[in-house]
A protein has these predicted regions:
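N-terminal intrinsically disordered, cationic/polar leader segments
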Residues: 1-36, 47, 51-114
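Short, surface-exposed ligand-recognition loops at beta-strand->loop->(often short) alpha-helix junctions
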Residues: 44
Length: 114
């Protein structure tokens, strides 16, 4: 299962995200290796968000990814500008859509104040 934790600051603004695990969707649906749809979608959305924040905004952040474990950490290191906040919120929106489509056996999303 993929576990997503959205980090929320004291102003109730999303300020980061932690993603870990593997969905197991391919195994459950008897797909062949390489057809892990849920993991691929989550990875594509997360990496696109981080690359977009870097390319299109001036908001500093820290990011780390471990391919084998499926771990992805992203956090703004100062208050996000409007563009950066929109990109993070767009990622969260996409992850919520994946959760709605494929269900909680494959992806869970929670929020944590930091």
């Amino acid at each position: 299962m993929i576990q997503v934790t959205v980090l929320v600051d004291s102003k109730q603004q999303n300020c980061g995200i932690l993603i870990s695990g593997h969905a197991g969707y391919a195994e459950a649906e008897r797909y062949q290796k390489g057809q892990e749809l849920v993991c691929a979608a989550v990875s594509a959305l997360a990496l696109n968000m981080a690359n977009s924040v870097e390319h299109f905004t001036d908001t500093p952040f820290q990011a780390d990814m471990e391919e084998e474990s499926g771990m992805f950490c992203f956090r703004f290191t100062q208050e996000a500008d409007a563009k950066a906040a929109l990109l993070l919120n767009s990622l969260i929106f996409g992850l919520l859509d994946i959760q709605e489509e494929y269900g909680e056996p494959y992806i869970t999303i929670c929020y944590k104040e930091v």
